């Protein structure tokens, strides 16, 4: 709870910075895609904060659905500015579209996924997150080194963190997962 709420200020500041950057450069696509990314980030952490803060069991189950669904939105929202601003060709558009289709699939089937297994859900998140590997060479050529390094580092942190998320016998495994996410 504290990790989600505490980082909210930084996410809002980051969103404002990105939107102003797009406005300053007169780039409507950048403003739109940065807004999609920032909004998906804020919505996920708001959902996560509510899910972890509300003790009512019935409300908690509904909020868990929203929380888990918003993870798909954040992954797609993260891909959107990279793919559409830096790769506005068929490859970038295809990867971005595929990412949003996986998000829609994950949200629609979230009730079933939640009943089956957290591991199945995690595998779908990881597949969506590493979708970029299907077009790795063009992505490496299109992204500046810093952007690529940050994207890979973020992907590795999230991916490695899923080990702790699924390690339910480990005390505070969920808190450790959140630390990886904030990284």
Question: What is each residue range found by the language model?
Answer:
Residues 105-112, 129-142, 159-167:
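Alpha-helical transmembrane segments in multipass membrane proteins, preferentially the mid-helix core
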Residues 57-61, 83-90, 110-120, 139-145, ...:
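Membrane-interface helix caps and helix-loop-helix hairpins in membrane proteins
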Residues 118, 141-183:
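Terminal transmembrane helical module of multi-pass membrane proteins
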Residues 11-17, 66-80, 122-136, 179-183:
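Small-residue-rich segments of transmembrane alpha-helices in multi-pass membrane proteins
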